UniProtKB/Swiss-Prot annotation:
Keywords: Cytoplasm, Methyltransferase, Nucleus, S-adenosyl-L-methionine, Transferase. This is Carnosine N-methyltransferase. Its EC number is 2.1.1.22. Changing residue 316 to A/E/N: Impairs N-methyltransferase activity. Optimum pH is 7.0-7.5. Changing residue 345 to A: Significantly reduces N-methyltransferase activity. It catalyses: carnosine + S-adenosyl-L-methionine = anserine + S-adenosyl-L-homocysteine + H(+). It comes from the Eukaryota. GO terms for cellular component: cytosol; nucleus. S-adenosyl-L-methionine binds at residues 164, 167, 208, 229, 295-296, 312, 324. Residues 1-25 are annotated as: Disordered.
Length: 409
């Protein structure tokens, strides 16, 4: 996705129907906004023309990227069936006496194929609903119209997105959410208690919101909350859950069928998860909850805007984490707090042609202090997982850092 700029949101309430609340599910919409380019200064006619040309090129690239990700959703079934067919060919290449030892193997592959078809149906439902998802931007029609082969990178992203449904919107992911989200929520409640604050006037930003559960939980408590996300994979999916799902556990997915290793039982690979585990439309009446799409550093530039910024498994997505710290310092109000929980698994490490500054937590803390933040809470070994397969023979655990720092008055 190309970088997109958008002014910070107003502190007033969202237009009627854009927040959560009771009533019929068809009337409840979480507003999704795409970042807007700011107007360039008119230095000269030539400069203005060059700026327009640059912006038009950015818009073209962004539109291409939008449709490329939709194509990946549509190509999922083809890609996964090719993977299963390859497994079948390899099995059939075994000696007949070895094949006879595994009479259920091909039947299991057929079950996986049915799971693939079901996942594809859900993915098509998601993208069929996202063409007009942004209240302030349209991407036109798909000029090609054909389903094209998607890159391995995009298919890996899509498979990862399916696991995000487990983390954010299934009962299976509750333990992971409790480990990652609850420490952040507890700090919000401690710093902005309802006995002393009107939560509707406490503006909280959640960069890297993913499928939106943390931001939604904060809005459920009555705070004015906005999630920000860069990935179209996440945005398409969060739009579907937040705006089109109201019946608890109506949908199911098979997120583990892509994992052919470390399965204790064959049935573990094809077990479903159900979502959403709550009604996303059950936000309190008058809730102020929205999502923005685009680059965190470019969308949020207005100084002294936010009472709280909550980052979860986010700061290691930076090319340069100091840029994130700089943005957070600028946009926090004096007296505002930054709550962070997560590891430091830098996303751009070892990627060719990508800037990546990998700092230790010690270095990050020193930078945070030099900006002027005051540390109020610091825990260096908060154990957590990320989109874990709880029945897998292999699991990754993170010893996360949790800190709360305050920008002085």
């Amino acid at each position: 996705m190309q970088r997109r700029r958008r002014p910070p949101p107003p502190t007033s309430r969202l237009p009627e129907g854009c927040g959560g609340g009771g009533g019929g599910s068809e009337e409840v919409e979480v507003q999704f906004s795409a970042g807007r380019w700011g107007s360039a200064a008119a230095v000269s006619a030539a400069a203005a023309a060059a700026t327009r040309s640059t912006e038009e090129e950015e818009e073209r690239l962004e539109r291409e990227h939008f449709w490329k990700i939709i194509n990946a959703f549509r190509y999922y079934g083809t890609s996964m069936h090719e993977r299963v067919n390859r497994t079948e060919r390899q099995f059939r290449s075994l000696p007949a006496n070895q094949q006879k030892l595994l009479p259920q193997f091909l039947l299991h592959l057929d079950k996986i194929r049915k799971c693939i078809d079901h996942n594809q149906e859900i993915l098509l439902t998601i993208v069929n609903d996202c063409i007009h998802m942004f209240e302030n931007k349209e991407y036109g029609e798909d000029g090609n119209g054909k389903i094209m082969p998607a890159s391995t990178f995009d298919m890996d992203k899509l498979k990862s997105t399916l696991k995000q449904f487990v983390r954010d919107w299934s009962e299976t992911g509750k333990a992971e959410r409790d480990a990652c989200y609850q420490p952040i929520i507890k700090e919000i409640l401690k710093n902005f208690p309802k006995e002393r604050w009107d939560p509707s006037k406490v503006n909280i930003l959640v960069p890297g919101a993913g499928l939106g559960r943390l931001a939604w939980e904060i809005a459920m408590l009555g705070y004015a909350c906005q999630g920000n996300e860069w990935s179209f994979f996440m945005l398409f999916s969060s739009n579907f859950v937040l705006n089109r799902c109201s019946e608890i556990n109506k949908y199911k997915l098979y997120p583990w069928i892509h994992q052919f290793s470390n399965n204790r039982r064959s049935a573990d690979q094809i077990r479903p998860i159900f979502f959403p585990d709550v009604d996303p439309h059950s936000l309190p009446p008058g809730s102020n909850f929205s999502m923005t799409a685009g680059d965190f550093q470019e969308i949020y530039s207005e100084c002294n805007t936010w009472d709280c910024i909550a980052t979860c498994f986010f700061i290691d997505t930076a090319h340069n984490v100091i840029d994130y710290i700089d943005t957070i310092w600028k946009i926090l109000k004096p007296g505002g707090i930054w709550i962070n929980l997560g590891p430091l698994l830098y996303h751009f490490e070892n990627l060719a042609n990508e800037l990546s500054i990998e700092l230790s937590y010690e270095d990050i803390k020193n930078v945070v202090l030099q900006y002027g933040f005051k540390v109020e809470v610091e825990k260096e070994s908060v154990l957590s997982t990320y989109t874990v397969n709880d029945l897998s023979m292999m699991k990754y655990y993170y010893e996360c850092v949790l800190f709360v720092v305050r920008k002085p008055q």
